Amino acid sequence: MATQSKYQSKQFDALSGDLIAILEKHKAPVDLSLMALGNMVTNILLENVQTGAQRLALAEAFSNALKNSLKIK
């Protein structure tokens, strides 16, 4: 999703691969996968971001990045 990242590709690829493997292990359909991932994002924001305004700003940036990654090039 991100065009630039402060994380190494190796670290990102390993984490992404693990998350995908878990969804595949549970044979999670698309809707269940999206629900689980959405809950993870919500929990990450609630547990790690101090203020409601910061959480909303990050959620907006995240949703914009997601939408931009889906645009046909």
Curated annotation (Swiss-Prot):
Q: This protein's superkingdom?
A: Bacteria
One Pfam family this sequence matches: DUF1414
What Gene3D superfamilies does the record point to? YejL-like
Q: Which InterPro entries match?
A: UPF0352 (IPR009857), YejL_sf (IPR023202)
Q: Which family does it belong to?
A: Belongs to the UPF0352 family.
Q: What is this protein called?
A: UPF0352 protein APL_0584
According to its UniProt entry, this protein's organism is Actinobacillus pleuropneumoniae serotype 5b (strain L20)
